[in-house]
């Protein structure tokens, strides 16, 4: 482990080397006097960096990641959003914008939905004033209330539903007795605890530090094109899956068989793998447990040790030097080292932060290039600790402050050693904050070798350094944010050379960019799919490139347990230019602009769309229906078992009549169980209805032509339907007159028959035949609704004086009936005087 041959003053750059005019030496802390003035960079270094920046580009084969395995059987809850925490009212006298948590609504909902949990501890305090059995107790000093009647009143009380719900005297007495206890003790205690929980949830919503380091790992297999993915899944992420994956010549992965899994007692937060001297180990961190397995390619994983962390584990790492060595750090500031030979030993303990005070209990530990030196980090900085030295001995490697030109409020989020297991180990460490990344050399503490503002909108908690695609190529560094954003950086410089960025970073597509590959769904299902794709990313892994598969295969794990993959390949124009052939010198620009992709834009293939469709079908089959909310009920059957509920024999109608007669207010408990109404049948939509045809024509752009044709058809059908109706009415009227005038004996036969019958036996008075004939003729010209009224009116008219009918010539009869039709008034035969025109509307 030698120092670099030359220490240039351009160790710290505002951007990648070769993309800026000169170094930024606005700060150099204690090294300012030791370093010389800035000098010109060597031509070969500038040319080689420029060739990296111009030629090395990775392009994705698809516009977004694709699902690798089907979704898990357990449902996934997206959790609470920002609008669920914030206060939605107005803020008066507020001079600066700040986040206000809505504790009042959350507390009221908690007391209403979980009253048994909130008020159960207060039972002993209120026991002396309440009696569970029997009637109310009489005492001059202590007021005792019967719980049976009280719960019966509470069972029908609806403070939020019915505005006319009346309060009984027992409820008022209960409010007086329990007011001091319920209003003060519960509200103060629960309010304080709930506010702490809301503050913790709000911090987790902004940045969930539990998945720092990532919960996804790639284990190399027997060949370069095969491997194994280790990741958690399930509703609680408590199942550790081992999935065999093979990579074909085109770079697409293929799942070999059903994955094996291990059931754990807690959620998996971090997965770390390491291969030392041919032995592969797997370490898993949960909230309060850590475990180590030995991985064999032919046998199932064998557990080595399970450790319990009382204060909660925050970080775990495997040694790249010694097989089986494990470093664990907890929230109490303790760092422990576990080995198969010596067991567990404490190497560092400090509850305080390194540089300045910070309330975060997060701690981190990792190894260095020296086997007996570890790094211990918190939000304020990173410190190197010698295990063999005295307690508290160490050297500060990084400090979040003016030494590193940090911004206000900038904190350390991840500290990772970039060395790989093997003889060619490096001394570089990656420090990630919410604004920038730093490359630190442990041989030069407190002096950043490289700084870059990553610009990620979410916290970068995931980082993976991969081997180069070919000899002489820079090493790709993957930087992942919790929101799903992934950046690809190229780190050049090994051994004694200075580390540098070979070109600006590349932003890779996120999981949410794959939404366009899925088929369009109804709005509710589309929202479920979008929420699933927007789940936070908790794992990042990659299959390293090799000679047989030069492409890069990137895997991402979401909080829902879904694994997505994306294939990256180097562009055909990307190649390294030898430093012996310098490029023409060009003026460097201040701002490092992102490269412009000269290649073709990737598009979705039919194979990718089919894979997304199959994954979506499996997801829709597993999506559960939302539970129907039901109002809470009060029951006293648990502690009042001997009291049976009274069953009323009265029907619902009788109860309603009695309540209306007395003027009482009915409660839901008085009516009993109401019958549930069956949902109406869903309307069956025909495929050939008018609306479907209209929408189809509108979608094809022929809405105007369809509407004109529809108007022509409607008007034509109306004209055709009106003309036959009018002709039918007129023809029936004239045909009735003609048929009656052509038959002169139509009225004589019935008259003679009626006369003979009347002489034989007495009969009640009837309507004369002429009147019946007149009624039938009238009924032909009157609407169907008024025919019965017309018959009743004709039946009420007086009969003739002579019992026998008077013969009337057919001509007079027809003229009389025609005149009656015109006047719409019946004309009777006989010597009766003419009647006035009736005023009944006929």
UniProtKB/Swiss-Prot annotation:
Residues 574-605, 667-690, 702-842 are annotated as: Disordered. Residues 745-760 have a biased composition (Polar residues). Residues 833-842 have a biased composition (Basic residues). The modification Phosphothreonine is found at residue 808. It comes from the Eukaryota. GO terms for cellular component: fibrillar center; nucleolus; nucleoplasm; RNA polymerase transcription factor SL1 complex. Its main location: nucleus. The keyword S-adenosyl-L-methionine does not apply. Residues 809-826 have a biased composition (Low complexity). The keyword Thylakoid does not apply. GO terms for molecular function: RNA polymerase I core promoter sequence-specific DNA binding; RNA polymerase I general transcription initiation factor activity. Gene3D superfamilies: YVTN repeat-like/Quinoprotein amine dehydrogenase (2.130.10.10). Keywords: DNA-binding, Nucleus, Phosphoprotein, Transcription, Transcription regulation. Residues 577-588, 783-794 have a biased composition (Basic and acidic residues). SUPFAM superfamilies: WD40 repeat-like. It is found in: Nucleus, Nucleolus. Component of the transcription factor SL1/TIF-IB complex, composed of TBP and at least TAF1A, TAF1B, TAF1C and TAF1D. In the complex interacts directly with TBP, TAF1A and TAF1B. Interaction of the SL1/TIF-IB subunits with TBP excludes interaction of TBP with the transcription factor IID (TFIID) subunits. Interacts with MYC and RRN3. Interacts with p53/TP53; the interaction prevents the association of SL1/TIF-IB with UBTF and represses RNA polymerase I transcription. Component of the transcription factor SL1/TIF-IB complex, which is involved in the assembly of the PIC (pre-initiation complex) during RNA polymerase I-dependent transcription. The rate of PIC formation probably is primarily dependent on the rate of association of SL1/TIF-IB with the rDNA promoter. SL1/TIF-IB is involved in stabilization of nucleolar transcription factor 1/UBTF on rDNA. Formation of SL1/TIF-IB excludes the association of TBP with TFIID subunits. Recruits RNA polymerase I to the rRNA gene promoter via interaction with RRN3. PANTHER family: TATA BOX-BINDING PROTEIN ASSOCIATED FACTOR RNA POLYMERASE I SUBUNIT C, TATA BOX-BINDING PROTEIN-ASSOCIATED FACTOR RNA POLYMERASE I SUBUNIT C. This is TATA box-binding protein-associated factor, RNA polymerase I, subunit C. The lineage of its organism: Eukaryota, Metazoa, Chordata, Craniata, Vertebrata. The gene is Taf1c.
């Amino acid at each position: 482990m030698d120092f670099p041959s030359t220490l240039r003053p351009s160790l710290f750059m505002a951007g990648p080397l070769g993309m800026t005019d000169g170094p930024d030496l606005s700060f150099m802390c204690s090294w300012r006097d030791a370093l010389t003035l800035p000098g010109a960079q060597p031509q070969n270094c500038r040319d080689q960096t420029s060739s990296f920046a111009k030629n090395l580009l990775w392009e994705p084969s698809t516009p977004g990641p694709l699902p690798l395995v089907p979704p898990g059987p357990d449902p996934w809850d997206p959790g609470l959003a920002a609008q669920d925490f914030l206060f939605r009212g107005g803020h008066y006298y507020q001079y600066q914008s700040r986040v206000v948590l809505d504790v009042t609504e959350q507390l009221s909902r908690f007391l209403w939905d979980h009253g048994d949990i909130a008020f159960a501890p207060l039972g002993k305090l209120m026991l002396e004033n309440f009696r569970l059995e029997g009637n109310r107790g009489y005492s001059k000093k202590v007021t005792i209330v019967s719980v049976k009647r009280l719960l019966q009143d509470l069972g029908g009380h609806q403070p939020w539903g019915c505005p006319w719900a009346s309060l009984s005297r027992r409820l008022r007495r209960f409010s007086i007795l329990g007011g001091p206890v319920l209003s003060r003790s519960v509200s103060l205690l629960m309010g304080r605890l709930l506010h702490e929980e809301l503050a913790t949830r709000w911090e987790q919503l902004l940045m969930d530090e539990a998945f720092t380091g990532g919960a996804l790992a790639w284990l190399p297999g027997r060949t370069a094109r095969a491997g194994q993915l280790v990741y958690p899944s399930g509703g609680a992420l408590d199942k550790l899956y081992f999935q065999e994956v093979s990579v074909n010549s085109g770079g697409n992965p293929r799942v070999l068989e059903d994955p094996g899994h291990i059931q754990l007692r807690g959620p998996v937060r971090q997965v770390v793998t390491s291969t030392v001297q041919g032995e592969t180990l797997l370490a898993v961190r949960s909230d309060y447990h850590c475990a180590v397995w030995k991985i064999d390619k032919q046998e199932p994983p064998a557990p080595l040790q399970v450790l319990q962390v009382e204060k909660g584990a925050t970080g775990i790492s495997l040694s790249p030097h010694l097989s089986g060595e494990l470093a664990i750090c907890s929230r109490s500031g303790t760092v422990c080292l576990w080995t198969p030979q010596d067991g567990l030993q404490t190497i560092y303990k400090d509850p305080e932060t390194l540089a300045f005070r910070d309330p975060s209990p997060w701690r981190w530990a990792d190894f260095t290039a020296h086997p007996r030196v570890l790094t211990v980090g918190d939000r304020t900085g990173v410190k190197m600790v010698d295990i063999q030295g005295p307690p508290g001995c160490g050297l500060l490697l990084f400090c979040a402050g003016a030494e590193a030109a940090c911004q206000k409020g900038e904190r350390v989020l991840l500290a990772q050693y970039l060395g790989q297991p093997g003889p060619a180990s490096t001394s570089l460490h990656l420090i990630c904050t919410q604004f920038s990344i730093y490359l630190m050399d442990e041989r030069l503490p407190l002096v950043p070798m490289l700084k870059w503002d990553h610009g990620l909108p979410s916290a970068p908690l995931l980082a993976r350094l991969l081997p180069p695609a070919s000899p002489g190529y820079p090493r790709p560094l993957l930087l992942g944010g919790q929101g799903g954003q992934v950046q690809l950086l190229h780190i050049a410089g090994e051994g004694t050379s200075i580390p540098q960025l070979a070109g600006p970073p590349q932003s890779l597509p996120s999981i949410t960019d794959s939404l366009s590959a899925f088929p369009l769904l109804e709005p509710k299902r589309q929202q479920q799919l979008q929420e699933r794709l927007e789940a936070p990313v908790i794992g990042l892994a990659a299959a390293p490139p090799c000679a047989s598969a030069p492409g890069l295969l990137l895997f991402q794990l979401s909080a829902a347990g879904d694994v997505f993959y994306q294939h990256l390949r180097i562009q055909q124009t990307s190649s390294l230019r030898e430093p012996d052939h310098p490029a023409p010198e060009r003026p460097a620009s201040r701002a490092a602009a992102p490269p412009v992709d000269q290649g073709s834009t990737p598009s979705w293939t039919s194979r990718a769309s089919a894979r997304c469709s199959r994954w979506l079908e499996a997801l829709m089959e597993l999506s559960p229906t939302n539970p129907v909310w039901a109002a809470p009920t009060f029951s006293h059957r648990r502690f009042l078992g001997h009291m049976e509920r009274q069953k009323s024999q009265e029907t619902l109608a009788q109860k309603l009549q009695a309540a209306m007669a007395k003027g009482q207010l009915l409660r839901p408990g008085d009516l009993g169980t109401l019958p549930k109404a069956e949902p109406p049948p869903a309307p069956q939509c025909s495929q050939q209805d008018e609306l479907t045809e209209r929408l189809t024509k509108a979608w094809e752009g022929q809405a105007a032509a369809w509407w004109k044709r529809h108007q022509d058809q409607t008007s034509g059908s109306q004209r055709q339907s009106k003309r036959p109706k009018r002709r039918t009415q007129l023809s029936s009227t004239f045909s009735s007159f003609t048929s009656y005038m052509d038959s002169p004996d139509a009225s004589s036969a019935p008259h003679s028959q009626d006369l003979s019958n009347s002489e034989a036996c007495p009969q009640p008075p009837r309507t004369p035949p002429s009147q019946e004939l007149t009624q039938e003729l009238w009924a032909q010209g009157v609407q169907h609704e008024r025919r019965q009224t017309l018959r009743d009116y004709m039946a009420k008219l007086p009969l003739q004086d002579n019992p026998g009918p008077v013969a009337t010539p057919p001509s007079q009869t027809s003229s009389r009936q025609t005149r009656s039709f015109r006047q719409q008034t019946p004309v009777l035969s006989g010597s009766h005087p003419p009647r006035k025109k009736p005023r009944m509307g006929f």
